[in-house]
Amino acid sequence: MASDSPARSLDEIDLSALRDPAGIFELVELVGNGTYGQVYKGRHVKTGQLAAIKVMDVTGDEEEEIKQEINMLKKYSHHRNIATYYGAFIKKNPPGMDDQLWLVMEFCGAGSVTDLIKNTKGNTLKEEWIAYICREILRGLSHLHQHKVIHRDIKGQNVLLTENAEVKLVDFGVSAQLDRTVGRRNTFIGTPYWMAPEVIACDENPDATYDFKSDLWSLGITAIEMAEGAPPLCDMHPMRALFLIPRNPAPRLKSKKWSKKFQSFIESCLVKNHSQRPATEQLMKHPFIRDQPNERQVRIQLKDHIDRTKKKRGEKDETEYEYSGSEEEEEENDSGEPSSILNLPGESTLRRDFLRLQLANKERSEALRRQQLEQQQRENEEHKRQLLAERQKRIEEQKEQRRRLEEQQRREKELRKQQEREQRRHYEEQMRREEERRRAEHEQEYKRKQLEEQRQAERLQRQLKQERDYLVSLQHQRQEQRPLEKKPLYHYKEGMSPSEKPAWAKEVEERSRLNRQSSPAMPHKVANRISDPNLPPRSESFSISGVQPARTPPMLRPVDPQIPQLVAVKSQGPALTASQSVHEQPTKGLSGFQEALNVTSHRVEMPRQNSDPTSENPPLPTRIEKFDRSSWLRQEEDIPPKVPQRTTSISPALARKNSPGNGSALGPRLGSQPIRASNPDLRRTEPVLESSLQRTSSGSSSSSSTPSSQPSSQGGSQPGSQAGSSERSRVRANSKSEGSPVLPHEPSKVKPEESRDITRPSRPADLTALAKELRELRIEETNRPLKKVTDYSSSSEESESSEEEEEDGESETHDGTVAVSDIPRLIPTGAPGNNEQYNMGMVGTHGLETSHADTFGGSISREGTLMIRETAEEKKRSGHSDSNGFAGHINLPDLVQQSHSPAGTPTEGLGRVSTHSQEMDSGAEYGIGSSTKASFTPFVDPRVYQTSPTDEDEEDDESSAAALFTSELLRQEQAKLNEARKISVVNVNPTNIRPHSDTPEIRKYKKRFNSEILCAALWGVNLLVGTENGLMLLDRSGQGKVYNLINRRRFQQMDVLEGLNVLVTISGKKNKLRVYYLSWLRNRILHNDPEVEKKQGWITVGDLEGCIHYKVVKYERIKFLVIALKNAVEIYAWAPKPYHKFMAFKSFADLQHKPLLVDLTVEEGQRLKVIFGSHTGFHVIDVDSGNSYDIYIPSHIQGNITPHAIVILPKTDGMEMLVCYEDEGVYVNTYGRITKDVVLQWGEMPTSVAYIHSNQIMGWGEKAIEIRSVETGHLDGVFMHKRAQRLKFLCERNDKVFFASVRSGGSSQVFFMTLNRNSMMNW
């Protein structure tokens, strides 16, 4: 009969007829956050008595359930162990909003049994306390069961205590009646850890049934909770617990300290077969319940404990940090389980006469109630306004403080910059003064030596005059003597003995004898040459690396001027190294140069060493003439000082001409070294030579050469030519130190004393032949076909600029990034006026000058790709090294957009070289210039991926990137080649073509991280960066500012789950799995919530340590977390409210292979399988059965392998995957069968591999970044590095891929690549 009463009385309840609680009850504070509503501590306005008020929204769907609950509370709450129901109210809300139902019940001020457990030392209650509480629960259940009512949700949280230690049950009958609502809300039914197996079976099988004995199972679990602090399986995910409870044996007490009566009581309650479980009345007679000590004594102990706890909690306790996250479902904003319920001193429990008190003296107190209500509302509003004002004031103060701090930092930064500029200016001024002082010293030394030489020359002149007079007299005497008669050599007086001859006569005679021995065929020629008084004086000229020193005054030697000599040195001679100064080279004697003198001069010159018998100076060096196309002697001036010089090998074409097989006499000249003695005569002509000659370099080539004297071909055809250089000389202009661009060298005007040599009517035969060969070489080079640049030069030069200077030179955008691809590139041009040498000089890309394309050694296509002329022989040897060490292909970044010269742009001389505010470096092949910033070079065809090894250098990792074209784009460029050849003027001004480009782009953030970047994750638009030393946030929405969030903690892996409001990480020294709350991290930046700062911002997932790798896998509405440990794999799953954390789902320990990489797949939406990679191969664990088996073991590789990635292929129902290891990847299914006859083959061993959501897979190697199709493994594109470097994938979203440079112990930077999705097929 009683069971029918709730249904019969439903019609009697009219929710709309319920009164409004305004003026009767008021809410004081929230004390509980339940699944079905919020529980407040309330106060009766008139009497001040406290009540528990449950507030629920009334919707049309739930009206019937609410009526049932009210009816059950009315009928069955009148028991000493059930919280008493006092009444219900409806709080009306405006249209469009649900009304609120207020259920008013007895208030239990001591909180729940769960709170009692938490506040007890060791989280365990005394056995007699447990027995008392269990007996009181059983009495309440007995009352309900007699009326055929099942509570369905017995647990510690629903068992409350009053101040007098009375036990009350709450929320009975609600769980079952609200099951349909719970299902609609997609939340978990009740609390699974306390649920009986038959209840779970009923959820799985609608035909199954259960009775009131299910409450007794829940009572047994609650008894374990009171004994051990938590129910069994509480660390498990609720879904996993629901699965395990019917399958596991009934739980038991873990500790042996409990009495046998208690253990027997647990065993009686926890009988899995509910039909064999004892009834409520039988359990009431169990010894553990029946044989209890003095009840009054137990209640006194409990009351004292409750009072002590209340005093300790008088101060606001720090609870575990609560946060809310969007689960993409309709949930309440607040989360968490009901916390302890506080009770103020003097509070008492409402009795059954509460309704009478509520309605008494209603008319008399109406006015007073209204006044109190209005006053209270005014006080509340005033309090709210005060709180808002205080908060606003605090926010304003924080803003002002931040503004002052930023202003102070800005001023300090400006002051530092100003000081640095002053220091730099002072240093430059000091260097300039030092340079001027050195120049003055050199000039003084030069003048002093000049005067000394003049005096020495005068002495020699007088001495030679005496010798000449003596020799003339001696000839006259010989003519007078008889031919056969031997006369004395000197005649002064008849009969003078040899001992009486003057000393100078003896010396002359001795020297003549020595000269006859050394060169008997020369004396008469020498005498004739010395007596020639008409030779003009010559100034010395000397050239190193194609740079000619400033003009120096000629030597004044009227009697015996020094004669220029052409010196030929073997091309096989050693290269001039950076450690050798020029004047340290050995000086050759006359005999070593005699052959060259006989060929190249009509006159034989006498060496200086035989002209002065008294000089102790070393022999004077030979002079090296400079030749121009139209002259024998040419000097250039206006050369700026302090220009570092580089020398490289000669061109391959010249090298072939000079090979022994060709029989050319050109070889001895090419590659010759300058010969310089230590005599001051030669050194004084170049006061700044030693300081300007920094070093020589040959890049990857096998030989380096310095210039030799060499004539040019047709005179006057190239007005800007540089004479006297047979090599590819390249000038690197350091604009930061010089402050001005390097200007082209203008030929100096020929001085009058040189005019006789310049207009000389004939040339030596070998020089004429040389000019002819060079003209033929130029014609041959001009007729070469154009060749597309596809290869890459791996050699690079050291950057001499400091890190600070490089940063100053970068073009920073508003978001703190540097457009790596927009850094100006240097394109090749012809050597200034020296086409027969094919010296590809450098053109400054910031300059405003243009050059004729016809003067380029190579020409530029419209798309900006460099074209190199190539002979037929070079075509055959394409891709191989020439004999001099050059690669057959030449590669340049194709970043400069070509166009005709705009109107009004002046056309400068053909050989102009201009630089502007950009430090330039020289490449190692063909003298081609490349930017020092270049770190990524594009390839137009993936087949040329195999490149020569890169050179390790100290160049700063300021990276740039270029466009990457496919073979389709290559064909389009080839089709436009003829049109590109017709371009006569090339605009070398860089144009930012990125916004209109379909090619990928790489940018970088200017921020340098002091420690190695290990991981990163996008949080909104910003980037969380994990390093060896902490967690930082890179503000991508602003100026690229970096905020430190956590210091001195290593972050190995991280993922942001914004819907859950958490950041999942592997962090710390012990590699724990920690979950950080995003709201806490946000407050670390904004500092706008002091309460949040006091609370712990993270929790650990289980007690896991030594985590190696994890993967977050979302399947339908469930988020799984699969974790690789040292020799185990754990699976956790996200539990929504009220848990709101990752909870254990399943564990697989003692694995045969150590997992290094893990993933989770759901086969055909039904079977869960863990895939993991080890040093042996790849393996699978069936989650249901726990069986493990191998799916791929690479047998062709000996030893351990390195697994890189596991990619579950789309549209395969989770059955097929691509597994990447070492430099390979294979396609297999979850049962170990190879699904595709293709192996993904990387060009090199990648350091990082990642799947991106454009259905591609990227590999980061030391030489390149490769992008391949996941479906086929085909190469879609590649970015080459300028030098070997380690890069690491961080994260990706949409069309952006983030990665970082990895430098152990050095600075690291963040890069991101923008992949244009619309053009991926054409890229």
UniProtKB/Swiss-Prot annotation:
Compositional bias annotation for Acidic residues: 317-335, 797-810, 950-959
Domain spans labelled Protein kinase: 25-289
Disulfide cysteine pairs (residue numbers): none
Main location: nucleus
Sequence ranges of Low complexity compositional bias: 691-726
Region (Disordered): 284-347, 397-559, 571-838, 939-960
Domain of life (superkingdom): Eukaryota
Pfam families: CNH, Pkinase
Compartment(s) of residence: Nucleus; Cytoplasm; Recycling endosome; Cytoplasm, Cytoskeleton
GO MF annotation, one: ATP binding
Active site: 153 (proton acceptor)
Biased composition (Basic and acidic residues): 288-307, 397-470, 477-494, 503-513, 623-640, 746-760, 772-790
PANTHER family xrefs: MISSHAPEN LIKE KINASE 1
Assembly: Interacts (via the CNH domain) with RAP2A (GTP-bound form preferentially); the interaction is direct and required for the activation of TNIK by RAP2A. Interacts with NEDD4; recruits RAP2A to NEDD4. Interacts with TRAF2 and NCK. Interacts with TCF7L2/TCF4 and CTNNB1; the interaction is direct. Interacts with TANC1.
Protein name listed in UniProt: Traf2 and NCK-interacting protein kinase
Protein species of origin: Mus musculus
